[in-house]
Amino acid sequence: CYLFTATQQLDESLDVLLGMVTHPYFTEQTIAKEQGIIGQEIKMYDDSPDWRLITGLFECLYHEHPIRSDIAGTCESIAAITPEMLYDCCKAFYAPGNMVLAAAGNTSMEQILAACARHGLMDERPAEKVERLLRPEPMTLAAAEKTIAMPIAKSCFGLGFKEEPLPFGDLRSEMLYELILCCICGGMSPLYRRLYDEGLTNPGFGGEVLRVDGCCCILFTGESDRPDTVRQLLLDEIERVRKEGVDREIFTLCKNEKYGQLIENLENVEDSASQMADFALAGQTVAQQI
């Protein structure tokens, strides 16, 4: 996703953006420069406890899915990148049928369409058919647990649950996952208050749902000196909710909070544009999601 904001010269800025994605330019020299920068970023992430925790969870949850691999690659893999490889990727993916251009603010549809026309994005052209070849992924776990030793003040921990992949455009199920997580361990839940009051976790403890093509999982992460205790309390709460259901009052609060967040994003120009693009790529509109 490419983002920019502008207070003036919007047409010129759009021309730079659309020119970049429609007519990319790669050389051995520019690639070598970026390889050095990305290599430093990879090493930086290797020193991040939070990042190592998440990648460790993915390695435990999945046997074959590409989510096991660090999205940035490795210093060895990026060293093999060539201009021809990047041009092939652009030809396959940087096609109008795969693009979403979202704009918010003091502009008009006519101005945006004119920018697209200047770069040939309004011309009819056959779409490149790209098929992602994913290896079969069993629903079993690749590993039950993993420990990573790092020199940090307080230990990070994560607990993951592997779920069946969601169909494309099924934002309703994703929203239900988020509401259930809010009811189980959100800031208004009894479990969150207990863990925080007893000093078992940090304020950043929480759960999230992650879904990509062929992958869906629930992740709980935080900091704790007693991760095994937190894990058991979390499992006990999940089992209680399975048997008794969610508290109606907490569910209403969580639903209103989520609704409020969606509305609040419409008050911010940058958030509005990002939200429109995200939902469009998922096959829906902001209005449908709300």
Regions found by a protein language model. Give the residues of each.
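Charge-rich, well-structured scaffold segments of protease-associated domains
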Residues: 1-130, 154-157, 163-168, 176, ...
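Short glycine/threonine-rich loop/turn motifs
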Residues: 171
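Short gly/ser/thr-rich secondary-structure transition/capping motifs
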Residues: 84, 140-141
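Short amphipathic
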Residues: 5, 141-149
